[in-house]
Amino acid sequence: MGSSTPSNELPALQEAFNFPDGPQSMLPATTFLIGFVLGPLFFAPLSEQYGRRPILISTLCLYIIFTMGTALSPNWAAFLIFRFLSGIFASPPMSVTGGSIADVFVDKVVRGRANMLWSSATLLGPLAGPVIAGYTYQYSWRWAFWASMAFSGICLIALVFQPETLATKILRDRAAKLNKEKGAERYIAPADMDKPGLLVTLKITTTRPLYLLCTEMLVALTCVYMAFVYAVFYMLLKIFPNIFHGIYGFTPGESGLAFVMMFAGSLISNVLGYFYDIYAQGLVRRHPNKHAEYLRLPLACVGGPAFVISLFWLGWTSRLSIHWIVPLLSMIPYGFGYQCIFMAMINYTADAYGIFASSALAALAACRSIAGAIIPLAVDSMIGTLGIAWSCSVLALISCALSLVPFGFIIWGEKIRAASNFSKKLQNAPHPDLELTRSVSIV
């Protein structure tokens, strides 16, 4: 929600801070997403070491503080600085939550459904931001940030009552409690045996996402695909005003209908995802020795073409001679395709990398945030040079090429993993769930 909130109140921000149209109009989203790049690289691996709950609560508190700073910004520079800091501390849920889901749900089918609901929320947030801003900007551009801050406060209250999910942290706390009760250091959690020093731990945990990105082809290709899909969303935040305001004369609030259509498409994908999970569960029972994570990918194989079609549809129907409902309806297959791609690729990555899911998801989050921050800066130049129709066509053609990624994983995924030293070690290691749920040991 925080990343896209300013997109529908740019006229009010330009009036308040007196900055020119063009690339600067994308800076509220860009600075936020740059923070999104940095956050997961540190917070996700640290959550694997020190627990999910402390990271989520502390960063959400700081996010609320910096969102308040954004709402109170006296000038353009302060606004952008607070947006950057907000982005850093808004990032942990994008990667840490995936790790929490992997902690709680051992069954891969149930975990897939939980990830489906979570990925729906990650789409609903960016969709809700412009809709809220479209109606609040007429009072003040600050109101959208007050609304975001209030919603975050509600989330913080709920988070306080959430228990820790990381098994190693639970065992560490249990050992500490027993030692306190006995008055002696008699108990130690398995994860603390031969535990490296703090600096070594930080080095390992903060470099692991980068290591996976550079050495794991599955992670790298998934990052490229999801990064481009994510960047297209932020490009549409700039393209929509050119279409619905520039061509059809919509108000910012009315332009929010496009985001409602996106959400309708995502709901359809969730229904499909639920019934596909039931089908996949049957396949797992019949073929228990197969890698179940590959059953996640067919959703992306369906979503990719829908995503491509929606961009062609939007670009070539956005003209005065065609009723506004036609380009608006293109956002239904867009939302469907976007959600299917994210559901499938996130679930596939989480299943494939097990206890290191947070690190792999952190690499995904960082790459898509970089793409979402940088690529949309070219939107104005692209539209000015190519026009709306051909701009959307270029995006559709690139998406078409990248939509082959999940098909490639289905065909060659096992060979790719067989050639990966990291995947070999992960598969040959003791089962992580058994290893992490042992009782504390007496020394």
Task: Describe the predicted segments one by one.
Residues 27-44, 260-273:
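Central cavity-lining transmembrane alpha-helices of secondary-active solute carriers
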Residues 13-14, 46-47, 69, 79, ...:
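Interfacial helix-cap and linker-helix signal at transmembrane-aqueous boundaries
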Residues 6-7, 204-270, 341-347:
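Extracytoplasmic gate region of multi-pass secondary transporters
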Residues 17-18, 42, 50-51, 72-78, ...:
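Helix-breaking motifs and short loop linkers at transmembrane-helix boundaries and internal kinks
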Residues 1-22, 38, 43, 93, ...:
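Extracytoplasmic
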